[in-house]
Amino acid sequence: MAFNPPVIRAFSSPAFTYVFKFPYPSWKEKEWLLHALLAHGTEQAMIQLRNCVPHPDEDIIRDDLLLSLEDRHFGAILCKAVYMATTTFMSQKQRNMFPRCDIIVQSELGETNLHCHIIVGGEGLSKRNAKTSCPQLYGLILGELIQRCKTLLATRPFEPEEAEIYHALKRAEREAWGGVTSGNLQILQYRDRRGDLHAQQVDALRFFKNYLLPKNRCITSYSRPDVCTSPENWFVLAEKTYCHTLVNGLPLPEHYRKHYHATLDNEVLPGPQTMAFGGRGPWEHLPEVGDQRLAASSVSTTYKPNKKEKLMLNLLDKCSELNLLVYEDLVANCPELLLMLEGQPGGARLIEQVLGMHHINVCSNFTALSYLFHLYPGTTLSSDNKALQLLLIQGYNPLMVGHALCCVLNKQFGKQNTVCFYGPASTGKTNMAKAIVQGIRLYGCVNHLNKGFVFNDCRQRLVVWWEECLMHQDWVEPAKCILGGTECRIDVKHRDSVLLTQTPVIISTNHDIYAVVGGNSVSHVHAAPLKERVIQLNFMKQLPQTFGEITPEEIAALLQWCFNEYECTLTGFKTKWSLDKIPNSFPLGVLCPTHSQDFILHENGYCTDCGGYLAHSADDSVYTDRASDTSKEAIDAGDLGDTDGEDSESEASEVGVRPSKKRRITIPATPPNSPGSSVSTSAFFDNWCAQPRDEDELREYERQASRLQKKRESRERREETPMATSSQESESEPNPTQWGDKLGVIPSGTPDQPPIVLHCFEDLRPSDEDEGEYIGKERL
């Protein structure tokens, strides 16, 4: 005989009711897939149950099937998963592994949705957080369902249609942790006089007795309630059905359901007409209470907030629900509530306190990266992304930079807690930094003008923006702590010093931040420790005026792609990009042979390895005749970076050799018999591992690059004419007279005279006497 759970006689308060909808709309047409995913092994029993006769006819096979499927069908598995997720949800709310709460879960097959009713009560839930906790509970339920689907994956791979349901659950789970439920988890609410919706507390036992219990059983949409429910357990007036019920983790059998309903109706929840006192006075046998005890018991312990406190609580809920961070957001989204609070005594101060509390809540629950994804969920990276374009123009791998930004903003990059964009004006450094901090929104700025309180605006922020950073002796020590992510205390105006926790820092400047200015002296003592805390990106190429601003959505798309593809930790970054140590000067990108950093070639997308734009496919209308006739063997491996299909040799003969652009210098492999060339090439790459910092270094860079280019061209010309060289070597060597002519040794006219040796600035000119001999004659 099945175990009958005891009747629940008290329910923890406050209690709320939720409805979870299975995030797969076409579940009824593919119900057999749910049998395989959630209740593997029950498919045949469900098919046999479809052909059984209804009650009250006798059917032994039907009774055996219902008994074997008591808690093994997919509705029971769904009910158990929801119960386990709700238990985890309450343990997180109470911060206890064994929460003290009451939970009732009932799964039902609706006309359109497969859903579960949840009644939960206990400490940790309140009118303020029950509604905002819906995404958290939704994500936990989907996680439990995914784990149960993986039990089938351990035995065999998914079928294509099963994989479709599995990926739908995974996609819904990612959206849930981003705060999106898509209406699949709802809480019972009421509307106040202003039209706002709030979570509605319920009388759990009455709700369970009047709404959930009086229903008939139906465990599959292929069958009917009169097949799954016996006549003695049939609710006559019930129109809706249920699938499975759990009361505090214990299943409620079908044959015990009417008795449970009668016990709740008669004993636990009696009406006013059933209260009787046996013919005696109601106060006759009560114990006597002393004056002091009566006075103590008559005092109400329930605290009732006043109007000001209610307004503050409502404003705090609005800030959390609508992501309101500054006073301007409050004016734009809830002006009525703001005016009501401004009308209270000290209203402006109260609003600052509410915003401060909301900032503390955001900083404790989010990092800069997670809050950016919370504000911009579902962004996709496209090839026309301006952040991608800017980093390619400046010579960096945008995916590598995005990976580093994810690690820094997620506080997972060790001691290097700062990203510095350095370069001259109009290079995009402020454009990039502004897009990052404005996407996060909760940021603080460093103010050099307020010399006593430089970091006054940096507390309770997700990120710090230091625009035009200048290092001074007065604040270099706290700056080293902040740039390195070390907790320190900072001075705040009109208050005591406050603790500043680890906060990522974004710097955009054209100053040398490693040189500390103090009085009339400049010190470089702090340069080494500052460089260990900063990742510097050198932006040296000026942008056109029509480049435009980078939007926060584009930054969010780049970082979201990197966060999904890479492991955003210090170890993951070093492993992915094969680095032993993260240098102060961020490494330049290395493009794949056929990929480009020019935005003109962005239509084919971007490379997921180097970040460059993919080359265009071959097109006869673009390529010239000569280029189209060129065979694969005639293409030089060093020229694979040029994919525009034009004859590069003819252009070089017309225009001449010019220095190549930054990071696009093509240096061929060094011949084995040329050790000098390999030394110069390796020295060139060692000297220019980072971009030039000023115009002098840029000129030196172009000079050395031009020299290497000329060496490569001369070596190619020598390789192209090997036969001419061999023919010259085969000729006979010159005789001494010929060597003398070449060296400038001229024999004299008389045998006794020594030969005439000509120096580099002399030639053999005839004397004046000799000139007279040739007058009127033709010189031989």
From Swiss-Prot:
InterPro entries: BoV_NS1-like_N, Helicase_SF3_DNA-vir, P-loop_NTPase, Parvovirus_NS1_helicase, PV_NS1-NUC
Keyword RNA-binding among UniProt keywords: no
Active site per the UniProt annotation: 211
Cofactor note: The endonuclease active site can probably bind other divalent cations.
Chain positions of motif RCR-2: 115-117
Role this protein plays: Multifunctional protein which displays endonuclease and helicase activities required for initiating and directing viral DNA replication. Also plays a role in viral packaging and transactivation of several promoters. Binds site-specifically to 2-3 approximate tandem copies within the origins of replication (Ori), unwinds this hairpin region and nicks one DNA strand thereby initiating the rolling circle replication (RCR). Becomes covalently attached to the 5' end of the nick and provides a 3'OH for priming DNA synthesis.
Protein name, entry field: Initiator protein NS1
Entry-linked PROSITE patterns: PV_NS1_NUC (PS52022), SF3_HELICASE_1 (PS51206)
Annotated ATP binding sites: 423-430
Amino acid composition bias (Basic and acidic residues), ranges on this chain: 700-721
Compartment(s): Host nucleus
Enzyme class: hydrolase
Polar residues bias (residue ranges): 723-738
Molecular function terms, GO-annotated: ATP binding; ATP hydrolysis activity; DNA binding; endonuclease activity; helicase activity; metal ion binding
Every SF3 helicase domain range: 397-552
Gene: NS1
Domain of life, per lineage: Viruses
Domain PV NS1-Nuc: 11-271
Domain notes from UniProt: In the N-terminus, the endonuclease region is involved in binding to the origin of replication. In the middle, there are the ATPase and helicase activities. The C-terminus probably contains a transactivation domain.
A GO term from the CC aspect: host cell nucleus
Motif mapping: RCR-3: 211-215
Recorded catalytic activity of this chain's protein: ATP + H2O = ADP + phosphate + H(+)
Biological processes per GO annotation: DNA replication; viral DNA genome replication
